[in-house]
């Protein structure tokens, strides 16, 4: 009775197997153990199967051995990365995964069956991810007497991630600890507040982010500035900008002045004064040789003179200015005015000729002058 009880207990333990938990870092290699003694009697009926239940409860087959064939490309996520680690026919059906990925995390089950006997084991695999390289930032103005916040954070990595700030020694005698007036935000360990900055607070600070898989770090430099020096720099920059604007304005005024002088010089010969005297007409006494020809053209000259009111008025003044002597015939004068270039001859209408004939008939002195000539 006692022997049967011991055999039953041993069979029960062999059937249920064991539960094992393994932690590995991503991109590394892992071997999940599974041992049995069911393949020795009959190898043809041996069946081995590895199953994965992920964190969401979904189950899938990883690798199997059946009918003397191995099937290890059953899932697209683990294709080419899973295999039996040793001689599974001799009793070592351990599973090897390389390289590890975060999606490989979950509960693995090894089932071995042969001739009605079976055994299985369970392995819980946790894939750890190293923290990504953190990003160090400064919040605030690094001026003397003010407060400055150092910010450090990793974008990815297995939780929890621990942050640690320290000062890097650049010179002999510098302290590696944070300044005395520094406070760590325990709700967010990646933030450190540096209060009441002094020139001694300047230096290089390093933040380290770490977890079970590893650690990464970043550095940032703090340069504390005097408030007076900032004012002087701002004043100097303002003065330089103002000076540059003034020089530009002077150059612009000079160019504008030269352009204006050049324009005045070009337009000066074409100016017309309003108080300038009009060109004077002069009277020319015709010679005896040309009197006949002028007499023949008297009609047309009279016609043209009547067409121009200004010429007619000047001729009348000339006639009055030259008094006639008794017994002598009046002399004919021709009005010579300033030469007009580029002027076209005016057209004389029929009505103008009619008016001219009427004027000639009503002017006795002018008619007598033409008759005498």
Curated annotation (Swiss-Prot):
Membrane topology: Single-pass type I membrane protein
InterPro entries attached to this UniProt entry: CLMP (IPR042454), Ig-like_dom (IPR007110), Ig-like_dom_sf (IPR036179), Ig-like_fold (IPR013783), Ig_sub (IPR003599), Ig_sub2 (IPR003598), Ig_V-set (IPR013106)
Polar residues: bias regions: 364-373
Residues that carry a glycan: 73, 196
Side of membrane Cytoplasmic, spans: 256-373
Tissues where this protein is expressed: Predominantly expressed in epithelial cells within different tissues and in the white adipose tissue. Expressed at high levels in the heart and brain, at intermediate levels in the lung, skeletal muscle, kidney and testis and at low levels in the liver and spleen.
Disulfide bond residue pairs: 34-110, 152-207
Task of the protein: May be involved in the cell-cell adhesion. May play a role in adipocyte differentiation and development of obesity. Is required for normal small intestine development.
Residue intervals on the Extracellular side: 18-234
Region span, Disordered: 263-373
Annotated Gene Ontology cellular component terms: bicellular tight junction; cytoplasmic microtubule; postsynaptic membrane
Organism this protein belongs to: Mus musculus
Keywords: Cell junction, Cell membrane, Disulfide bond, Glycoprotein, Immunoglobulin domain, Membrane, Repeat, Signal, Tight junction, Transmembrane, Transmembrane helix
Induction or repression: Up-regulated in mature adipocytes and adipocyte tissue of obese animals.
Residue ranges of the TM segments: 235-255
Highest taxon of source: Eukaryota
Residues covered by the Ig-like C2-type domain: 18-126, 134-223
GO terms under biological process: digestive tract development; postsynaptic modulation of chemical synaptic transmission
Name of the protein this chain belongs to: CXADR-like membrane protein
Localization (cell): Cell junction, Tight junction; Cell membrane
Signal peptide: 1-17
Compositional bias of kind Low complexity: 287-313, 321-332, 353-363
Segments of skewed composition (Basic and acidic residues): 263-280
CDD domains, A to Z: Ig, IgV_CAR_like
């Amino acid at each position: 009775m006692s022997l049967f009880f011991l055999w039953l207990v041993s069979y029960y333990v062999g059937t249920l197997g064991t539960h094992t938990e393994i932690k590995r870092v991503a991109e590394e290699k892992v071997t999940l153990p599974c041992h049995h003694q069911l393949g020795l009697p009959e190898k043809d009926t041996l069946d081995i199967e590895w199953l994965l239940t992920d964190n969401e409860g979904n189950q899938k087959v990883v690798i199997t051995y059946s009918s003397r064939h191995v099937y290890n490309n059953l899932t697209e996520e683990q294709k080419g990365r899973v295999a039996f680690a040793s001689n599974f026919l001799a009793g070592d059906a351990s599973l090897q995964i390389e390289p590890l990925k975060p999606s490989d995390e979950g509960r693995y089950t090894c089932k071995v069956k042969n001739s009605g006997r079976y055994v299985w084991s369970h392995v819980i695999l946790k894939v750890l991810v190293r923290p990504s390289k953190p990003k160090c930032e400064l919040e605030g103005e690094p001026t003397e007497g003010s407060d400055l916040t150092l910010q450090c954070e990793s974008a990815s990595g297995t939780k929890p991630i621990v942050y640690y700030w320290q000062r890097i020694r650049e010179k002999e005698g510098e302290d590696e600890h944070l300044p005395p007036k520094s406070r760590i935000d325990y709700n967010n360990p990646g933030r450190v507040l540096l209060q009441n900055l002094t020139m001694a607070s300047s230096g290089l600070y390093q933040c380290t982010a770490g977890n079970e898989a590893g650690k990464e770090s970043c550095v940032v430099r703090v340069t504390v500035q005097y408030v007076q020096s900032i004012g002087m720099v701002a004043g100097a920059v303002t003065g330089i900008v103002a000076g540059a604007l003034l020089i530009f304005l002077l150059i612009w005024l000079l160019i504008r002045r030269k352009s204006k002088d050049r324009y005045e010089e070009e337009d000066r010969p074409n100016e017309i004064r309003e108080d300038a005297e009009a060109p004077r007409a002069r009277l020319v006494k015709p010679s005896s040789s040309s009197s006949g020809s002028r007499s023949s053209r008297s009609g047309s000259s009279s016609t043209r003179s009547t067409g121009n009111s200004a010429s007619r008025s000047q001729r009348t003044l000339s006639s009055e200015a030259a008094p006639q002597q008794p017994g002598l015939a009046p002399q004919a004068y021709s009005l010579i005015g300033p030469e007009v270039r580029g002027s076209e001859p005016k057209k004389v209408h029929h009505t103008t000729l009619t008016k001219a004939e009427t004027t000639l008939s009503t002017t006795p002195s002018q008619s007598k002058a033409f008759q005498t000539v």
